Amino acid sequence: MAWSQRIEQALVKRRLDGQYRQRHPTGQADGRTLSVAGHNYLNFSANDYLGLSHDGRVVRAWQQGAERYGVGAGGSAHVTGYRAPQAELEHQLADWLGYRRALLFISGFAANQAVIAAMMAKNDRIFADKLCHASLLEAASLSPATLRRFGHNQPSALAKLLAAEGEGETLVVTEGIFSMDGDRAALKPIHQLARDRDGWLLVDDAHGVGVCGEQGRGSCWQQGVQPELLIVTFGKAFGVSGAALLCSDATAEYLLQFARHLIYSTAMPPAQACAIQAALGCVQQGDDLRQRLAANITRFRQGARGLRGQLASSDSAIQPLIVGDEQKVLGLARRLRDRRCWVTAIRPPTVPPGTSRLRITLSAAHRENDIDHLLEALHATDGE
């Protein structure tokens, strides 16, 4: 089969299955609104949970950082790309989250891939929640370790898998708050199970850090758990981009020697690190923002009662409305756009077959009347 035939067949099948993805260039966008093709919408698809992407303190920090350090790092952190703002940010993150070290990555995807690729060896075992992010599952499947997936958020299922004897090291992988369902991992029993097997726990808390726990320290802090490997990202509640791994001194030094995503990639721009430092300050002092977000979540869930779709059991900013069929959820998303609500339809392979959904995300930037407008639109389109 020629390359062109393979590509065309894959695209045709993706269209026929109702799973074809498209991008929509947006104009002005923030945690509350966005514009597409000249039309303005209330934005219920962003991960800007605290509305910090347009916060003046964060924007000015990036501008001032760019004026001082330029707009790029100019090289790998192992060459000339590691500057004072990145070093300061790593120290601040480690101190804030109670770890010895933090290492910056250009994205959460890169952090997850780098850690698993560098840490795992033949005969090792990875036990991952079935609904973990694609970056985690892909890295695990490509590693030399054996991957076993346990039932979503089921410590008992994990315990059964862990009971089998193995030769190498054990790594348990989960998320703090799951990106497509919005529910929280049972971190305490999961961590205890890993420790009982002399294993380590890796938690990707992309959707928890900033929005839960004291000072927004995240899911692990909230549940009183300190995993051996903690990934936090800055593209959600922090409103910026990038990620960090929190770990021990020895683990950090090991990854600086063996994590190819760190060694062979241009480092995070110093100006970006300046913006993240400013966002960190906003997060630490952001109890009012978290209270506003919590109020918006409560308002939405109370008003969503009676909708025909299945509203997932979630108290996080991620509020999935399960519709099931791909074409139905696409039609519902279009009808919501007609009412000036931008809500993204999520379909397989991102979510399991038969669970296509509207992934509704809420922000502290939303106003009460924004939530009410969305609810009115959902109820109006529910039977169409």
UniProtKB/Swiss-Prot annotation:
Catalytic activity, reaction form: 6-carboxyhexanoyl-[ACP] + L-alanine + H(+) = (8S)-8-amino-7-oxononanoate + holo-[ACP] + CO2
Residues reported to bind pyridoxal 5'-phosphate: G108, F109, S179, H207, T233
A Pfam match: Aminotran_1_2
Keywords: Biotin biosynthesis, Pyridoxal phosphate, Transferase
Record-linked PROSITE patterns: AA_TRANSFER_CLASS_2
Molecular function in Gene Ontology: 8-amino-7-oxononanoate synthase activity; pyridoxal phosphate binding
Record carries keyword Transferase: yes
Function: Catalyzes the decarboxylative condensation of pimeloyl-[acyl-carrier protein] and L-alanine to produce 8-amino-7-oxononanoate (AON), [acyl-carrier protein], and carbon dioxide.
UniProt record similarity statement: Belongs to the class-II pyridoxal-phosphate-dependent aminotransferase family. BioF subfamily.
PANTHER family according to UniProt: 8-AMINO-7-OXONONANOATE SYNTHASE, CLASS II AMINOTRANSFERASE/8-AMINO-7-OXONONANOATE SYNTHASE
Annotated protein name in UniProt: 8-amino-7-oxononanoate synthase
Gene it is expressed from: bioF
